[in-house]
Amino acid sequence: VRDGYIVDDKNCVYHCIPPCDGLCKKNGGKSGSCSFLVPSGLACWCKALPDNVPIKDPSYKCHKR
């Protein structure tokens, strides 16, 4: 398990909607909160996510189209 900014399959963060605590728990984490991530803005930070749930990799950009 690890802590981090939860992301979708394109390495894009979730922007605090839906509420982070529910999103993180739904994905197997212990808890979640809204935090500021440069340059993404407000994003969901999760504690104790399972290893199979993707978290933000700063070496790759978000690839939304």
Swiss-Prot record:
<keyword id="KW-0528">Neurotoxin</keyword>
<dbReference type="GO" id="GO:0005576">
    <property type="term" value="C:extracellular region"/>
</dbReference>
<dbReference type="InterPro" id="IPR002061">
    <property type="entry name" value="Scorpion_toxinL/defensin"/>
</dbReference>
<dbReference type="Pfam" id="PF00537">
    <property type="entry name" value="Toxin_3"/>
</dbReference>
<dbReference type="InterPro" id="IPR044062">
    <property type="entry name" value="LCN-type_CS_alpha_beta_dom"/>
</dbReference>
<dbReference type="InterPro" id="IPR003614">
    <property type="entry name" value="Scorpion_toxin-like"/>
</dbReference>
<feature type="domain" description="LCN-type CS-alpha/beta">
    <location>
        <begin position="2"/>
        <end position="63"/>
    </location>
</feature>
<keyword id="KW-0964">Secreted</keyword>
<comment type="similarity">
    <text>Belongs to the long (4 C-C) scorpion toxin superfamily. Sodium channel inhibitor family. Alpha subfamily.</text>
</comment>
<keyword id="KW-0738">Voltage-gated sodium channel impairing toxin</keyword>
<feature type="propeptide" description="Removed by a carboxypeptidase">
    <location>
        <position position="65"/>
    </location>
</feature>
<feature type="disulfide bond">
    <location>
        <begin position="20"/>
        <end position="44"/>
    </location>
</feature>
<feature type="disulfide bond">
    <location>
        <begin position="16"/>
        <end position="34"/>
    </location>
</feature>
<comment type="function">
    <text>Alpha toxins bind voltage-independently at site-3 of sodium channels (Nav) and inhibit the inactivation of the activated channels, thereby blocking neuronal transmission. Electrophysiological studies of this were performed using sodium-channels expressed in F11 cell culture, by patch-clamp recordings. Affinity of this toxin toward sodium channels in F11 cell line is in the order of 1 uM concentration.</text>
</comment>
<dbReference type="GO" id="GO:0019871">
    <property type="term" value="F:sodium channel inhibitor activity"/>
</dbReference>
<keyword id="KW-1015">Disulfide bond</keyword>
<dbReference type="GO" id="GO:0006952">
    <property type="term" value="P:defense response"/>
</dbReference>
<dbReference type="InterPro" id="IPR018218">
    <property type="entry name" value="Scorpion_toxinL"/>
</dbReference>
<keyword id="KW-0872">Ion channel impairing toxin</keyword>
<keyword id="KW-0800">Toxin</keyword>
<feature type="disulfide bond">
    <location>
        <begin position="24"/>
        <end position="46"/>
    </location>
</feature>
<dbReference type="GO" id="GO:0090729">
    <property type="term" value="F:toxin activity"/>
</dbReference>
<feature type="disulfide bond">
    <location>
        <begin position="12"/>
        <end position="62"/>
    </location>
</feature>
<protein>
    <recommendedName>
        <fullName>Sodium channel alpha-toxin Acra4</fullName>
    </recommendedName>
</protein>
<dbReference type="InterPro" id="IPR036574">
    <property type="entry name" value="Scorpion_toxin-like_sf"/>
</dbReference>
